[in-house]
Structures are given as C-alpha cells and as structure tokens.
Design a protein with these regions (language model features):
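Beta-loop motif signature
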Residues: 72-114
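Assembly/oligomerization scaffold segments
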Residues: 1-78, 146-205, 209
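An acidic/polar, Gly/Ser/Thr-rich interaction patch typically located in mid-to-C-terminal regions
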Residues: 32-76, 81-88, 146-157, 308-442
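Boundary regions of SH3-family modules and the immediately adjacent low-complexity/disordered segments
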Residues: 126-148
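Short acidic/polar beta-strand-loop edge motifs in secreted extracellular
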Residues: 61-63, 69-71, 210-233, 243-268, ...
Length: 442
C-alpha cells in the first residue's frame, strides 16, 4: 500500500540469480521493458542502464558475464576433447547464418568453445574421415574419445544467469493501492554496449536460444501419444511444466520427430492441430485461440476517449486473406476425405476469392472441416491489427480481448497478441498493446 498523497509512480524490482540488485541499478536505470507475447515467441525482458563512467561495462557487469560464460561452458565438453562429428553444416564464424559446406561425419577435436554463440563449437577433423574445419552447432557433435555416441547432443550442464523482475504501479489511481505485475524469470540472452553516451542494454528471454529444448536436435518415433503427453514428456526432461488449456487433445498412432528440436517439433504439431503454443516462466502453454477469442472483451477503447496516449492501425492483404480452405486426404483404403471452411462473409460470385489447399491425414469429413477452419484462421488472423499505447496498466496482458469503437473498418473485437510494459528510471509507466482482429464466424 502507498500513501494516497504520494504522486503516482512505478517501481521495478530486479533479481540476478536470486540476489536483489534493485538498489544497485537504481541510479543507472534508464528503462525496464517486459514484453508478453501471446504465441510463437518467447517473452523477453530488456534493461537499459546509463554507463557514462563505464562502471557497468568494465567492472560489475563484466564480472557477472564472465561468471555466466564460465558456468555455461561446463557442459561435459572442453577444448581438446575428440568428439564424433555427425555430418552437418560447418561455418566460418560462430555467428554466420550461411554454411560453408556440409562435410561428412567423422572424429574431430574441439579447439574453441563459445557457449551461447549461434554455433558454439569450433572443431577440426583428426584422421581425414571428415574434412570438417569450422564452427558447428551443439547438435552436430556427440560423444567423446573412448565414449559412445548418441542421436542427440547434450546441452549445457549448468544454467545461465537468471533474471527476475516485478513491476509495481504505486498509488496509480490515487487510492493508495499498488498494482504488481510479476514479469517472471528469464535467462540472460545478450548484453549490448553503445555510446556515446554510454548505455548498457541487457536482454533476457524466457526460452533462450541456447536452451536444450530449443537447440538440441532429437530423433524419435512417438507411438500412441496424445499431444498433451508429448508436451508433458518434453517439458519434464527439460525442467519445465505444462499447461494444456485446449478442449481437444489430438492423438497420434505414430508421429516422427527427425533431427528436430523438441520445441520446433511441438510447435509444428500445434500448428497442424490448429492450436497455439507459448513458453513463459518455465512453462509450456498450449491453448486454442478460437476459445480465447470467444471470451468477453475485458475493456473498450473508443476513438477520442483519452484512455490512450496514441494509436496506430494496419491492414494487410498479401498472404493473409483467404476466402476458404479445403483439407483433403486419401486414406490407405483409397477413400477420399474432404472438408471445406469459408470466411463468414464469403461471396461465391467474387472473382478474387483465394482458397487455401491443405493435405493432411484426417479420419472423417467432420474432422477435415474442423481442421480447415483452424488453418483458415491461422492464415487470416493478421489481416487487421491495431496498436495502442496506454498509461501503465498491469492488467493488459497477452491473450485478453478488447473492443475498439469509432475507428471505421478497424472497429471491432481484438485479441492482444503482444503487450509491452515499460518503466522509466524516473517512475513513468506505459503499456503498449498490439491486437489482431478476432475471426468471429469461423
């Protein structure tokens, strides 16, 4: 609780590996931003610090980073280890996106380790079996000299630096009440120094690129599993939990995961089933957007009502607007199954109608039509979007719905695909909401 006579302001609490550093960073804090995404992207946290004296870059922060890098490198491999190269691409630099060839498999020696890099291991072939010479992914090496090999590579044995943050709006409505937003726990992703003037930007994300569930490629056949069961098993082995919030739980006789990370494979299964996935605060969350869109709007924003600071809207057509979707499948018995879904304002006479064609295994016409509806929604959902910047509001989070009125063709019901909460060093607080128009009627 705050004193009702206190000027409204926002505060943030920050912890590094469980140590409260709020008072340490307060004199340097420029801003703290928490981005909450609805699906297909990790939540992230960004902290900007002024560093005119170089205190953060050359002293305290450098020690923290060095400690983190040292810990993250203790993954069972070390410089000098001879490992089995599995035969994937190699790169000239640890940050390159374009491969420098794809040598065949063979033994190789680790010469440099840059844990956290896009391609963390530099290796050189040892006996001419392979001609690998360059940077490779963790998933492309396995086993040590004298040891066996496995189909998947191990990830980091130690955890990266964890950052936790909470935003508190103090006396925000002049009633003495405080409103807290727990941003969750994140792992250090990058540190950027820029200037002049000196600024340090610390970025942390909920599901780091270097995490095993995201980077380690696996091969496995899943027999007689439900989607929730696959998610639970993947979450458990990666130290996470699962929230399965969809009414329908697809079941698979057999589905193959081949040299694909757990999170990429799970995301593809969700998309194929018309479901959504997000990872946040150590949880894998699977839900049905159609169900969320059907919930009552939490608030209404009307043009000129002064509830917002600014707004923008966009209308996209290319690649985002299909009039119908057809799902078809020919079963082992030669029987053809087909289901078609249409947008709610479908005009059969229109010459501009585009139909999305999907070939997927289904067992009935009803199942085909249900999948067609979900695929149509997946491809059409970003046609109309609106963005509002409001005075700070901890209640405006991803997944909620709201109404926009008085905005012409952009009026209607929206679901929040992203909310960004930003606190300034002086105590200011804003919330930016990006919403996409809901797809009622199909």
């Amino acid at each position: 609780m705050s004193d009702e006579n206190t000027a409204r302001h926002a505060e943030c609490t920050v912890e590094f590996d469980g140590v409260d550093i709020t008072s340490s960073i307060a004199p340097y804090l420029l801003s703290l931003s928490f981005t909450d995404n609805e699906e297909d992207a990790s939540d992230d946290l960004q902290i900007k610090l002024q560093d005119r004296e170089g205190v953060w870059m050359t002293d305290w922060l450098q020690k923290m980073i060095d400690g983190d890098v040292s810990a993250a490198s203790s993954d069972g491999y070390k410089v000098g280890d001879v490992v089995q190269f599995l035969g994937g691409p190699h790169y000239k630099a640890s940050t390159d996106k374009k491969a420098n060839g794809k040598p065949k498999a063979g033994p190789a020696k680790i010469t440099i380790i840059k844990q956290g890099a896009l391609h963390p291991y530099h290796i050189i072939h040892t006996d001419g079996t392979s001609r690998v010479y360059g940077w490779v992914d963790a998933s492309e090496i396995s086993g040590k000299s004298g040891g066996g090999s496995s189909d998947s590579s191990s990830g980091s044995g130690e955890e990266s630096l964890k950052i936790r943050a909470t935003i508190t709006a103090c006396n925000w409505h002049s009633d003495g009440k405080d409103e807290a937003l727990d941003c969750g726990t994140f792992e250090l992703d990058s540190v950027v120094a820029s200037g002049p003037p000196g600024i340090i930007t610390i970025k942390a994300i909920g599901l780091p690129y270097t995490s095993q569930i995201r980077q380690t490629k696996q091969s496995k056949g899943w027999e007689k599993y439900k989607l929730s069961g696959i998610a639970n098993e993947m979450a458990s082995k990666n130290g996470m939990t699962t929230q399965f919030l969809a009414k329908k739980d697809p079941e698979y006789k057999r589905v193959e995961q081949y040299r694909c990370s757990d999170i990429d494979f799970l995301q593809q299964l969700c998309h194929d089933a018309g479901l959504s996935l997000k990872c946040t605060d150590g949880k894998i969350v699977i839900f049905d957007q159609q169900e969320y869109e059907g919930k009552d709007a939490v608030w209404t924003t009307t043009l000129g009502d002064k509830s917002y600071i600014k707004y923008s809207h966009s209308l996209g057509q290319a690649g985002t607007q299909y009039a119908s979707c057809r799902v078809s499948y020919v079963g082992p018995d030669g029987k053809a199954i087909e289901g078609i879904a249409y947008v709610k304002d479908y005009d059969a006479k229109s010459k501009t109608n585009q139909q999305l064609e999907v070939y997927a295994p289904v067992t009935s016409k009803a199942e085909a039509k249900e999948l067609a509806v979900k695929k149509l929604r997946l491809y059409n959902k970003y046609e109309r979007q609106m963005s509002f910047t409001y005075p700070g509001d901890s209640g405006k989070v991803a997944g909620l719905t709201f109404n926009a009125e008085g905005f012409g063709p952009w009026s209607g019901k929206y679901i929040v695909k992203q909310s960004k909460h930003t606190v300034s060093g002086s105590g200011g607080y804003t919330t930016q909401v990006i919403g996409r128009h809901t797809l009622g009627g199909y």
